[in-house]
C-alpha cells in the first residue's frame, strides 16, 4: 500500500503509534495527554475516538492480542498505566488503572498471548512491574525492584517458545523472559522462575555509552538463537545474540548512526529490523548469510 499522510488531530508531539492486530486501526500517544484511535484503509483514515484520562504526556500505547477482546494499554508521565476497553464500537472506557509507580512510566509491553493477558511496565522510579490478568477479572502483580536504579526506559518480552523449539510440539512450558533498557546504559535480561524475577544475564549487557532508549526482542519462529536489538542515545544500535539457554550474550554494533536512536522494531518473522534515528530517518536492516547486517532500504517520510 502506498504511503499516506494521516492527520492525527493531536495538539502536541506524537510519541508513539501502534497498529492493531488486523492493521485496521492506529492508536497514537501524545504530549497533549490524550490517545487517538484512527481507522485506516487504502482509501484514507478517519478519527474514531479520543481517550482522555492521563494527567501528563502519554509515552506509549500497545494493543493486546484480539483473543482478549479490544484492549489497549497506555503509559504516561503521570505514573499511571491504563487498560482501555472497547465496549460498543468506538466507545472506550478505563477498565483498569495501575498507579503502582512513583514516577513516569516510560514503556509498556504485552507478553506473548500464550502467557495470558500480561503487561510489563518500565518506570523512571527504577522498577519494572508485571501485571497478569486473573480469570475473576482481578490482576496479579510481580515486580523487579531497582531493575535500572536511575530509570527504566524500555521493556520487551521474549518469544514464548525457546529458540529452535518445535512450534506446536506442546512439550515445553512457555518461556517467561523480559529484556529491559535503562538510564544506566545497560540492557538486562530477566527470567520469571518459581514466582520471582531473576537476572538472567551475567553481567548486564553494557556496550552502550549513554542511555538505552529502546530494546526489542526478535521473534524467533524457527530461528536457532535469541536476538535482542538495543538503541541508544549514543547513536548506536547493537544486536545481541545468545545461541542457547544459559549462553553469554554476544553484542555486535549494527551501525553508529551519528545521532540518538529512538526506536527499534522487528518484522513479524524476526529477520528485518527497522531503526528510527534522531535525524528523522527510518532504515530497514537484514542479516546477511555471513552474519553481517546490511541496510535494505530507507523509508521515505
What is each of the regions a protein language model found here?
Residues 35-40, 61, 81-86, 128-133, ...:
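WD40-repeat beta-propellers
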Residues 1-11, 44-46, 250-251:
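A short helix->beta-strand "capping" segment at the edge of beta-propeller domains
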Residues 17-23, 62-69, 109-116, 156-175, ...:
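Loop/turn segments within WD40 beta-propeller blades
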Residues 96-190:
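Solenoidal tandem-repeat scaffolds enriched in leucines and small polar residues
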Residues 163, 213, 223-226, 236-238, ...:
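Terminal intrinsically disordered, low-complexity extensions flanking WD-repeat/beta-propeller proteins
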Residues 29-32, 74-78, 121-125, 180-184, ...:
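Conserved strand-to-loop turn within each blade of WD40 beta-propeller repeats
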Residues 7-14, 51-58, 98-105, 145-152, ...:
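WD40/WD-repeat beta-propeller blade N-cap
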Residues 13, 22, 47, 57, ...:
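WD40/WD-repeat beta-propeller blade-loop signature
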